[in-house]
Structures are given as structure tokens and as C-alpha cells.
Amino acid sequence: MAKLTKAKRGKNRWIGLSIRDSDISRTELSHLLEARLQGKGWKLFDLQKHENYKVAIIKTTLEDSSEVRDRINSTDDLSTITTSGKIRLVRARITDE
């Protein structure tokens, strides 16, 4: 089967998150995001520790990205830092924070 062209693959958004709990594991964060983002497509890519908090990067569709950001920002323990169509830019921005 032929590979889909770039235009037919759909657009994604990468969202950089800040997590207050510096001891949260990847599994715990996945469960937390599952509860918050029910019905929305997402995938956890990176989870790194900074000074007294952790940062993560999730991938979501362009169509769901606004709703996903709103749901994440509606909680006290999670907040979005940046959003982009390229993971490289999100990684650069969250490491500069």
C-alpha cells in the first residue's frame, strides 16, 4: 500500500505542558490526561524534570487542539506552556523556560 502524502495525513499540534507535581511518573500523568481529555485524541511524547516541576509534550490533532488546551488549563495541577505544529519548536521553547 502506498504511503499517504503529507497533505492527506492530517495536521497535528504539539502542546508543551507544565506539571506542578515534580514526582509524577509517566504512567500517572497518562492516567491524569486520560481523565481530563476523554473523547479527544492525544499521545504523550516527552516527560522531563526541570527545577521544581516537570514538563511534558503531547501530540493532538489540529481540530482537537483548542479543546485540549482549554481542558488542560482548567485544572490547577497542569498548564500549557506553548503550542506548535513542530515538536522541535516545542522542545526548544520548553527548555528555554
Kindly give the residue locations of the regions a language model identified.
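RNA-recognition motif
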Residues: 43-52
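Short active-site oxyanion
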Residues: 54-56
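Conserved short beta-strand edge segments in small beta-sheet-based binding/regulatory domains
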Residues: 77-90
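Short, low-order "capping/linker" segments at domain edges
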Residues: 89-97
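Short amphipathic alpha-helices in soluble, non-transmembrane regions
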Residues: 29-33, 68-76
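Short amphipathic alpha-helix segments
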Residues: 23-43
